[in-house]
């Protein structure tokens, strides 16, 4: 048994960034030369952070080609290291590096995102922090979901959850308006925002605080009322004096977009969570009709 918990089997190469609860390094497995991502977790006084334990248990439960693989867990002194497969870059960095994404690549990335999500949701796991930075891609065109730090097993009936989830720009309106009971539709809203960002090459709703985020959504999609979204006026953060914006047609929001893409994104950005398309349903949408899915 190695005194360092097995850490000496890996050579750290460079720091990749900060995750939900610790630093992430690119490293090489000395014996095989395989590149890995090492996620270093600071152990709290009472042991392993609950977010880390959640990620470990969920990822071991969810082996799927569109979910980042967890190879190993190393315990070294007062630190825990998660050893993940390494991918070249994330979707955010890639989008920043190109003038535009070609329509077929958008379709492929969206399909793979939905595949990983449908699988996770099928295992009753919400991701809750979907954003381009958490979607890893490789040079072969594969896309995988990463950073399940906020992920949560869904219990039925829908439980009361914290609403401090998801980077503001990708946060579902029911969460922004203070709903504490929510389920898989929160992830589908985030997918709609990511899809829109790939189509327009800029974030769909880039608010700088919660009320700004709410207003940005309302300006684009219209201010919802009980006729559009039954029960919205009873949510804790809903205010009857919200400005009444009419909303814009989807072909104006996404001017260079094919009609089937507009139809799919409209189904993802439904205000009423129960009317929002599921990942499983979205995979069957005719938008993907011309995509060669044998690759996935």
Swiss-Prot record:
Enzyme Commission number(s) from the entry: 2.7.11.22, 2.7.11.23
Subunit structure: Forms a stable but non-covalent complex with a regulatory subunit and with a cyclin.
A Pfam family of this chain: Pkinase
Inhibition and activation profile: Phosphorylation at Thr-20 or Tyr-21 inactivates the enzyme, while phosphorylation at Thr-162 activates it.
GO CC annotation terms, alphabetical: cyclin-dependent protein kinase holoenzyme complex; cytoplasm; nuclear periphery; nucleus
Residue positions of the active site: 129
Phosphothreonine found at: 20, 162
A GO term, aspect molecular function: RNA polymerase II CTD heptapeptide repeat kinase activity
Protein's UniProt name: Cyclin-dependent kinase 1
Protein residues bound to ATP: 16-24, 39
Modified residues (Phosphotyrosine): 21
InterPro entries assigned to the protein according to its UniProt record, in alphabetical order: CDK, Kinase-like_dom_sf, Prot_kinase_dom, Protein_kinase_ATP_BS, Ser/Thr_kinase_AS
GO biological process, one term: regulation of cell cycle
Protein kinase domain sequence ranges: 10-288
Gene3D superfamilies for this protein: Phosphorylase Kinase, domain 1, Transferase(Phosphotransferase) domain 1
Reaction equation(s) it catalyzes: L-seryl-[protein] + ATP = O-phospho-L-seryl-[protein] + ADP + H(+); L-threonyl-[protein] + ATP = O-phospho-L-threonyl-[protein] + ADP + H(+); [DNA-directed RNA polymerase] + ATP = phospho-[DNA-directed RNA polymerase] + ADP + H(+)
Keywords for this protein: ATP-binding, Cell cycle, Cell division, Kinase, Mitosis, Nucleotide-binding, Phosphoprotein, Serine/threonine-protein kinase, Transferase
Lineage: Eukaryota, Amoebozoa, Evosea, Eumycetozoa, Dictyostelia
CDD domains listed in its UniProt record: STKc_CDK1_CdkB_like (cd07835)
Segments passing through the bilayer: none
Record function comment: Plays a key role in the control of the eukaryotic cell cycle. Required for entry into S-phase and mitosis. p34 is a component of the kinase complex that phosphorylates the repetitive C-terminus of RNA polymerase II.
Gene transcribed to yield this protein: cdk1
Origin superkingdom: Eukaryota
SMART domains given in the database record: S_TKc (SM00220)
Protein family according to the UniProt entry: Belongs to the protein kinase superfamily. CMGC Ser/Thr protein kinase family. CDC2/CDKX subfamily.
């Amino acid at each position: 048994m190695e005194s360092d918990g097995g850490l000496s089997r890996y050579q750290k190469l460079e720091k990749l960034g900060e995750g939900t609860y610790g630093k992430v390094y690119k490293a090489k497995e000395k014996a095989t030369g395989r590149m890995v991502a090492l996620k270093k977790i600071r152990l709290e006084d009472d042991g392993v952070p609950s977010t880390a334990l959640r990620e470990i248990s969920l990822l071991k439960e969810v082996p799927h080609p569109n979910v980042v693989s967890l190879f190993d867990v190393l315990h070294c002194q007062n630190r825990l290291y998660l050893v993940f497969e390494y991918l070249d870059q994330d979707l955010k960095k890639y989008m920043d590096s190109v003038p535009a994404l070609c329509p077929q690549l958008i379709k492929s990335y969206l399909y793979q995102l939905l595949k990983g999500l449908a699988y996770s949701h099928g295992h009753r796991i919400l991701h809750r922090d979907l954003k381009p930075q958490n979607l890893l891609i490789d040079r072969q065109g594969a896309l995988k979901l990463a950073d399940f730090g906020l992920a949560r097993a869904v219990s039925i009936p829908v439980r009361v959850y914290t609403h401090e989830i998801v980077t503001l720009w990708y946060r579902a309106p029911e969460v922004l308006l203070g709903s504490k009971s929510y389920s898989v539709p929160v992830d589908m809203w985030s997918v709609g925002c990511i899809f829109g960002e790939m189509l327009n090459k800029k974030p769909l709703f880039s608010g700088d605080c919660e009320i700004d985020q709410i207003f940005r959504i309302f300006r684009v999609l219209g201010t919802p009322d009980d006729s559009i979204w039954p029960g919205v006026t009873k949510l804790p953060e809903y205010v009857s004096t919200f400005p009444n914006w009419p909303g814009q047609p989807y072909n104006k929001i996404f001017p260079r977009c094919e009609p089937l893409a507009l139809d799919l994104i409209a189904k993802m950005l439904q205000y009423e969570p129960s009317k929002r398309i599921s990942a499983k349903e979205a995979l069957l949408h005719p938008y993907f009709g011309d995509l060669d899915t044998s690759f996935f």
